[in-house]
Every structure is written in C-alpha cells, then in structure tokens.
A protein has these predicted regions:
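Structural signal for interior beta-strand "rungs" in well-ordered beta-sheet cores
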Residues: 1-124, 128-131
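Conserved catalytic-core motifs of eukaryotic protein kinase domains, centered on the activation segment
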Residues: 134-135
C-alpha cells in the first residue's frame, strides 16, 4: 500500500511511553468478540472474577473492574478508572478517564459518565446524572 501526502501535512515523531503493567483476568470472566483491553502502564489492568464484557468494548490502561460486573456491547472505559462489584454498564456507555464507580451501580445505555458514582446508584444521560439510589437493605 502506498502513502500519498498532500499539502500542509505535519508528521510528528512518535513518543512511546513504556507500559510495565499487565492485564490480569480473574476466573470465570467472559470476553466477547472484538474487545480490546490495554495493559497497564504503571499498574495492572484488572478484570474481576465473573465479569462479562460484551462485543466491541474497549478497556484502557490501569482500569480495575470488580467482580460480577457486566459491560454491554460497545462500552468504552477510560484509563485509570475503577468500577466496583456487581455493576451493569449499558450498551454504548462511555466512562471518562480516572472515574470511580461504586458497587452495585447501573449505568443506562448510551450514557456518558464524567463524574464519580457512589454505591447503589442508577445513572443515565449525557452527562450521566443520578436517577435513583438503590437500597437492598
């Protein structure tokens, strides 16, 4: 394949940041087709036991996902994000870098999470906002 460049093109030298972490996938995890999981840059990327990651999801570097969490198709999780246990992230949801999502959280389909989410919260929208706190007690 040939490369043809037209006028006013600037090509910059690529800087490579070393990634020393790993991807740790615990027991009973399901990962569907076309998913990408980036290895950690300074710490590991961790997928917790019993988690289900559906088709075409992207999980960036240094992400930690708790146990029994479900990411529906085309979910994108930004770098250094922490997702708790027993969470459900709806189809095509997007999580910004460095977000903390508590345990038992539901993120509505198509939502864009740009703020941390407390335990047992249901959020939806762009940007995602709290709809209801779940109390299982």
């Amino acid at each position: 394949m040939d490369l043809h460049l037209k006028e006013q093109i600037i090509l910059l030298e690529l800087e490579k940041f070393p990634h020393h972490g790993q991807v740790v996938i615990e027991n009973d995890v399901e990962i569907f087709a076309n998913c990408s999981i980036a290895r950690g840059s300074l710490s590991d990327t961790i997928i917790g036991q019993g988690t289900k990651i559906e088709t075409s999801c992207h999980i960036a570097h240094n992400v930690t996902i708790g146990k029994d969490t479900e990411l529906r198709a085309r979910t994108i999780v930004g770098g250094s994000t922490t997702i708790g246990n027993n969470c459900w992230l709806g189809l095509n949801s997007t999580i910004k870098n460095k977000i903390k999502i508590g345990d038992q959280v539901i993120v509505g389909s198509g939502s864009s999470v740009i703020y941390d989410i407390v335990d047992e919260d249901i959020v939806a929208g762009v940007p995602a906002k709290s709809i209801k706190i779940i109390k299982n007690h």
